[in-house]
Amino acid sequence: MAEEQVNRSAGLAPDCEASATAETTVSSVGTCEAAGKSPEPKDYDSTCVFCRIAGRQDPGTELLHCENEDLICFKDIKPAATHHYLVVPKKHIGNCRTLRKDQVELVENMVTVGKTILERNNFTDFTNVRMGFHMPPFCSISHLHLHVLAPVDQLGFLSKLVYRVNSYWFITADHLIEKLRT
């Protein structure tokens, strides 16, 4: 807390506060130089596990081939279904409540990637698929991510609750797209 107050009083740019250390210096234009590192771009958060995965800084996560340059896809570490994938924007976006109307295409692209990944894994019964987002404060990671689950008819009791269609804590991708358009 004291370090944060010192950093604010030193005139650090807001982007630099998170990476500021005792060795931080401020140049005449107010840029951040923490141990020789440049400030993080606003679309990257070094404390976010999904940002690190997108930046290929987590060698333990296998990225699935994704033909969209703005998105990544990988298997959920605690799968609720035989096919449980996460489709994640490379740029840091907080959650589904922070989305704007002009980001409908992003969500549509996430759904397209999810369907493509399922097809590549020989799952084509799209009537037995659930795609959606957890609503804050029920997001385990504060980086937008689409859950792609199949087959839905084989979800366990708890998973049926956790991924319940358009509940207080989970919204389907189709419903989110509809809400963003209105």
Swiss-Prot record:
| Localization (cell) | Cytoplasm; Nucleus
Active-site residue list: 145 (tele-amp-histidine intermediate)
Residues recorded with modification N-acetylalanine:
2
- Where it mainly occurs, coarsely classed, is cytoplasm
This protein is called: Adenosine 5'-monophosphoramidase HINT3
Asked whether the keyword Transcription regulation is assigned, the reply is no
Domain HIT: from-to ranges: 49-160
Could you give the subunit structure recorded for this chain?
A: Forms dimers to octamers and even larger oligomer. Interacts with CALM1.
Sequence motif Histidine triad motif, residues: 143-147
Describe the family membership recorded for this protein in Swiss-Prot or TrEMBL: Belongs to the HINT family.
One GO cellular component, as annotated: mitochondrion
Supply one GO molecular-function term.
Answer: adenosine 5'-monophosphoramidase activity
Name the catalysed reactions: adenosine 5'-phosphoramidate + H2O = AMP + NH4(+)
Span list, region Disordered: 1-42
Concerning InterPro entries, the annotation shows: HIT-like, HIT-like_sf
Q: Where does AMP bind?
A: 76-77, 145-147
Asked if the record carries the keyword Transferase, the reply is no
Identify which top EC class this enzyme belongs to: hydrolase
- Coiled coil, from the record: none
Q: What is its EC number?
A: 3.9.1.-
The task this protein performs is described as:
Exhibits adenosine 5'-monophosphoramidase activity, hydrolyzing purine nucleotide phosphoramidates with a single phosphate group such as adenosine 5'monophosphoramidate (AMP-NH2) to yield AMP and NH2. Hydrolyzes lysyl-AMP (AMP-N-epsilon-(N-alpha-acetyl lysine methyl ester)) generated by lysine tRNA ligase. Hydrolyzes 3-indolepropionic acyl-adenylate and fluorogenic purine nucleoside tryptamine phosphoramidates in vitro.
Relate the outcome reported for changing residue 145 to A: Abolishes adenosine 5'-monophosphoramidase activity
Q: Which Pfam families match?
A: DcpS_C (PF11969)
